[in-house]
């Protein structure tokens, strides 16, 4: 049987803002349909809560510092290989439609089917899904990525179906008129994106290739609200991930196994009969290893185990982020129960576009609205913590899932903190991550040559801020 792969990628979407992950507000019937027919993964994580690093770790199976794509709008090192090499050499048609956010071209020899890099909200759909029909109806096996722009801001697909005044504000947000307005528009973007997933599923069904197609939906990193995107908190790093494979994945099932985006390509190679350990990724880690950072969770997909990873890792750099701090490197490690974070330049203030106070860009006024509308001192201090954080943070995720109660200075947790710190530093060493030194070099990893399709957009956006 010829196995085909299709990945549908959202953009800046919280993992829990869709029906399969508990939302009773946001209408996502097609994501739910995919979940009904496949397996939902409850503990999938990216290691960066920014678009370009997230997408490139998915495509390469490498963590960001090792690949070179660790700041936003960045590219991998020239020698790094991607899924396009591995599946192309196996005879696959490797194609992508929609948002790129990868480079250089030699590392991603992909048949690009077109699309825009940011949704303008005009002239109908921003992706012409008709262009995928020749790929999915052909005789060759295919690996197709449908890379969405939604629900990334600007939110311009309307907000009529979610009335701001009727929304219930989650406990990890501050209730303000601007919060309600933004959520209404953000939810509408998700429902619009869901409709495009529905159209994609219809195309696959029409050519009658569903039985031998692995269909995946993933939400990318978290939303562009405080404590989401641009952080190492779970609202930034946790992602929805649903896989359907008729006859191989049991319908309407869930897995609690812990995994990361770097595991996806090794898993899909394993699924088509390849040994992921035999691939040279083009860039060695500090021990000389040229294998993937990720490891296959094919046994989880087959329902043979609920065990995969014990720890996941996170990184954030503000270098090159629009309105970002000059230097605010963040590193994290997460077990099932605890999250440990180091803010390596904690004496600085944390900035990004959410804190910019730019009246021409409504998203940058949201943080100020949270300061003004906090209901009590405890909530106000939590909002202020977004900009001013200590060197260490430690959270009990089972009792504090939204990471509000920092345990790092409590003596009872000293041994737990030390153990997680050792694991974090071991991972950083293996990746060649020098902390602040790597942070300062991050700016040179950005696509400043104009190679990437999104480069001109970023330059225009910067000129307005």
Where are these regions (language model features)?
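C-terminal helical cap and adjacent loop that interface with cofactors, partners, or active-site loops
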Residues: 398
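Beta-rich accessory regions
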Residues: 426-429
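Short, charged, surface-exposed hinge/linker loops at domain edges
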Residues: 436-451
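Formylglycine-dependent sulfatase
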Residues: 4-386, 390-392, 401-422, 435-436, ...
């Amino acid at each position: 049987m010829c196995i085909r792969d299709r990945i549908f990628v959202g953009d800046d979407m919280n993992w829990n803002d869709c029906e399969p992950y508990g939302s009773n507000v946001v209408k996502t019937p097609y994501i739910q349909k995919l979940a009904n027919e496949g397996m939902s993964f409850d503990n999938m994580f990216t290691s960066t809560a920014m678009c370009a690093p997230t997408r490139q770790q998915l495509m390469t199976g490498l963590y960001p510092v090792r690949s070179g794509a660790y700041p936003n709008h960045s590219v991998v090192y020239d020698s790094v290989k991607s899924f396009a090499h591995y599946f192309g050499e196996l005879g696959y048609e490797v194609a992508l439609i929609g948002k790129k956010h990868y480079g250089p071209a030699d590392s991603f020899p992909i048949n690009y089917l077109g699309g825009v890099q940011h949704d303008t909200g005009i002239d109908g759909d921003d992706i012409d899904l008709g262009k995928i029909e020749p790929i999915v109806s052909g005789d060759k096996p295919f690996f197709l990525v449908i890379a969405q722009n939604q629900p990334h801001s600007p939110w311009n697909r309307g907000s009529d179906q979610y009335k701001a005044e009727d929304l219930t504000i989650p406990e990890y947000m501050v209730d303000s008129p601007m919060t309600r307005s933004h959520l209404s528009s953000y939810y509408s973007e998700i429902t619009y994106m869901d409709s495009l997933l529905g159209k994609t599923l219809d195309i696959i069904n029409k050519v009658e290739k569903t039985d031998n197609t692995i269909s995946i939906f993933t939400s990318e990193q978290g939303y562009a609200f405080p404590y989401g995107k641009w952080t190492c908190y779970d609202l930034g790093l946790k992602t929805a991930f649903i896989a359907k494979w008729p006859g191989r994945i049991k319908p309407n099932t869930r897995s609690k196994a812990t995994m990361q985006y770097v595991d996806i390509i090794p898993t899909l190679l394993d699924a088509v009969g390849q040994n992921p350990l035999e691939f040279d990724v083009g860039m060695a880690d500090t021990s000389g290893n040229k294998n993937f950072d990720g490891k296959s969770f094919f046994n989880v997909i087959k329902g043979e185990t609920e065990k995969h990873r014990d720890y996941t890792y996170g990184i954030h750099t503000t270098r090159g982020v629009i309105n970002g701090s000059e230097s605010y490197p963040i590193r994290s490690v997460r077990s099932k129960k605890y999250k440990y974070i180091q803010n390596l330049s904690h004496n600085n203030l944390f900035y990004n576009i959410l804190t910019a106070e730019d009246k021409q860009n409504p998203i940058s006024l949201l943080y100020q609205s949270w300061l003004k509308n906090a209901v009590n001192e405890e909530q106000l201090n939590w909002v202020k913590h977004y900009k001013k954080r200590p060197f260490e943070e430690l959270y009990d995720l089972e009792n504090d899932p939204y990471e509000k109660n920092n345990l790092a200075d409590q003596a009872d947790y000293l041994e737990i903190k030390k153990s997680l710190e050792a694991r974090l530093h071991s991972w950083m060493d293996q990746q060649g991550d020098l902390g602040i030194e790597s942070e300062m070099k991050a700016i040179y990893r950005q696509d400043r040559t104009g190679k990437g399709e999104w480069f001109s957009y970023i330059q225009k956006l910067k000129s307005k801020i």
